[in-house]
């Protein structure tokens, strides 16, 4: 059994409620990487896609057991924001249990917050997670439609522009709901603006 098959076997064994979303991310990841980064292999994109929410439904105890076992530290925002835990615990499993390469692991790690200077696979998983077809939130649909329109126009910055738009919407939502915003998200947005992305 290769690594991708093992990840899928272990994932489906969890009886996840989110499996449709994860499958949607896998499908979108293939589409996005084929359009922008065809050098990324299908297996690489799929490993990252299937790992990204691998621990999403874990309990607090399960997350923190992983953090302790693998020496994963949380900053103040992460410690106070439960929705960020799964990215770090899934990263730990990707790296230490499944032995996936660093590119896949960082794509899993930053799929929720983004970061400045995201690498190709990180961009693929970040956007795939936001726009996959089962997402029905207004913001997700808006970014999905915007990305499709930019691609149709053959905009060379379609991917980065869609990511920037999603970051704007995420920050706005977090501000309006008075929740903490991770510094990586601000830095990801500012980096794209400095690169001239609109």
How does the language model describe each region?
Residues 1-15:
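Generic N-terminal amphipathic, Lys/Arg-enriched alpha-helix
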Residues 3-5, 87, 104:
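N-terminal alpha-helical segment
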Residues 4-8, 26, 30, 91:
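An amphipathic alpha-helix signature
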Residues 6, 42-77, 90, 108-114:
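His-Asp-centered metal-binding catalytic motifs of divalent-metal-dependent phosphohydrolases/nucleases
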Residues 13-23, 27-38, 51-55, 62, ...:
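Divalent metal-dependent phosphate-bond-processing catalytic cores, especially two-metal-ion Mg2+/Mn2+ enzymes
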Residues 17, 78-79:
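A generic structural signal for short
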Residues 82:
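Catalytic, metal-anchored helix/loop core of enzyme active sites in primary metabolism
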Residues 86-95:
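Alpha-helical segment that forms one wall of the substrate-binding/catalytic cleft
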């Amino acid at each position: 059994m290769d690594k991708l098959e093992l990840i899928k076997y272990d994932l489906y064994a969890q009886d996840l409620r989110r499996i449709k979303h994860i499958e949607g991310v896998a499908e979108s990841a293939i589409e996005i990487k084929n359009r922008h980064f065809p050098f990324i292999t299908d297996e690489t994109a799929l490993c990252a896609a299937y790992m990204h929410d691998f621990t999403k439904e874990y309990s607090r105890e399960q997350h923190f057991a992983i953090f302790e076992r693998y020496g994963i530290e949380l900053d103040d925002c992460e410690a106070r924001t439960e929705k960020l835990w799964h990215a770090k615990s899934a990263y730990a499993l990707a790296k230490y249990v499944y032995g996936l390469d660093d590119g896949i692991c960082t794509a899993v790690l930053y799929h929720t917050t983004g970061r400045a200077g995201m690498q190709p696979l990180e961009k693929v998983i970040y956007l795939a997670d936001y726009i996959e077809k089962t997402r029905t939130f207004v913001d997700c649909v808006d970014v999905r439609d915007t990305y499709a329109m930019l691609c149709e126009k053959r905009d060379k910055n379609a991917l980065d522009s869609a990511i920037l738009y999603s970051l704007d919407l995420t920050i706005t939502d977090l501000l309006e709901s008075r929740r903490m915003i991770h510094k990586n998200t601000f830095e990801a947005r500012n980096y794209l603006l400095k690169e001239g992305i609109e």
